[in-house]
């Protein structure tokens, strides 16, 4: 009998000057970047939290605390590799991931395919199992006022054991 688990994740980071904007492992040209201890890739962080949550393994702050200097400037795709290994070590496989990035600017649609490709390579999944959408917050709240970018993700895990 196949078992399934579903997890959801969320992340938000402030937009600031002097930092690159990295989403889904892709550097995107923009005048502002996301502030954070690592590369502040909100999409990848939300995906990691969804994967961890599906197995009740806590959140990324437990595994990669922002107070630990060894994670300063970390490439979030490298962290995603480690989270994926935790999932595999417990006998689970990723069924699919669906996500949305919320940002007023820049327009993200031209970058979605590259983000999907990067994430699918790290997770060794077919790109059609990775859903990434982009939307705005209709100028509402801190994301709508271009103070930050956030992301939501849902992950489905399966196990035959």
Curated annotation (Swiss-Prot):
<feature type="site" description="Transition state stabilizer">
    <location>
        <position position="37"/>
    </location>
</feature>
<dbReference type="GO" id="GO:0016114">
    <property type="term" value="P:terpenoid biosynthetic process"/>
</dbReference>
<feature type="binding site">
    <location>
        <position position="13"/>
    </location>
    <ligand>
        <name>a divalent metal cation</name>
    </ligand>
</feature>
<dbReference type="GO" id="GO:0019288">
    <property type="term" value="P:isopentenyl diphosphate biosynthetic process, methylerythritol 4-phosphate pathway"/>
</dbReference>
<keyword id="KW-0479">Metal-binding</keyword>
<dbReference type="InterPro" id="IPR036571">
    <property type="entry name" value="MECDP_synthase_sf"/>
</dbReference>
<keyword id="KW-0414">Isoprene biosynthesis</keyword>
<feature type="binding site">
    <location>
        <position position="11"/>
    </location>
    <ligand>
        <name>a divalent metal cation</name>
    </ligand>
</feature>
<dbReference type="GO" id="GO:0046872">
    <property type="term" value="F:metal ion binding"/>
</dbReference>
<feature type="binding site">
    <location>
        <begin position="135"/>
        <end position="138"/>
    </location>
    <ligand>
        <name>4-CDP-2-C-methyl-D-erythritol 2-phosphate</name>
    </ligand>
</feature>
<feature type="binding site">
    <location>
        <position position="45"/>
    </location>
    <ligand>
        <name>a divalent metal cation</name>
    </ligand>
</feature>
<dbReference type="InterPro" id="IPR020555">
    <property type="entry name" value="MECDP_synthase_CS"/>
</dbReference>
<dbReference type="Pfam" id="PF02542">
    <property type="entry name" value="YgbB"/>
</dbReference>
<feature type="binding site">
    <location>
        <begin position="37"/>
        <end position="38"/>
    </location>
    <ligand>
        <name>4-CDP-2-C-methyl-D-erythritol 2-phosphate</name>
    </ligand>
</feature>
<comment type="similarity">
    <text>Belongs to the IspF family.</text>
</comment>
<dbReference type="InterPro" id="IPR003526">
    <property type="entry name" value="MECDP_synthase"/>
</dbReference>
<keyword id="KW-0456">Lyase</keyword>
<dbReference type="GO" id="GO:0008685">
    <property type="term" value="F:2-C-methyl-D-erythritol 2,4-cyclodiphosphate synthase activity"/>
</dbReference>
<protein>
    <recommendedName>
        <fullName>2-C-methyl-D-erythritol 2,4-cyclodiphosphate synthase</fullName>
        <ecNumber>4.6.1.12</ecNumber>
    </recommendedName>
</protein>
<comment type="subunit">
    <text>Homotrimer.</text>
</comment>
<comment type="pathway">
    <text>Isoprenoid biosynthesis; isopentenyl diphosphate biosynthesis via DXP pathway; isopentenyl diphosphate from 1-deoxy-D-xylulose 5-phosphate: step 4/6.</text>
</comment>
<feature type="site" description="Transition state stabilizer">
    <location>
        <position position="136"/>
    </location>
</feature>
<feature type="binding site">
    <location>
        <begin position="11"/>
        <end position="13"/>
    </location>
    <ligand>
        <name>4-CDP-2-C-methyl-D-erythritol 2-phosphate</name>
    </ligand>
</feature>
<comment type="function">
    <text>Involved in the biosynthesis of isopentenyl diphosphate (IPP) and dimethylallyl diphosphate (DMAPP), two major building blocks of isoprenoid compounds. Catalyzes the conversion of 4-diphosphocytidyl-2-C-methyl-D-erythritol 2-phosphate (CDP-ME2P) to 2-C-methyl-D-erythritol 2,4-cyclodiphosphate (ME-CPP) with a corresponding release of cytidine 5-monophosphate (CMP).</text>
</comment>
<feature type="binding site">
    <location>
        <begin position="59"/>
        <end position="61"/>
    </location>
    <ligand>
        <name>4-CDP-2-C-methyl-D-erythritol 2-phosphate</name>
    </ligand>
</feature>
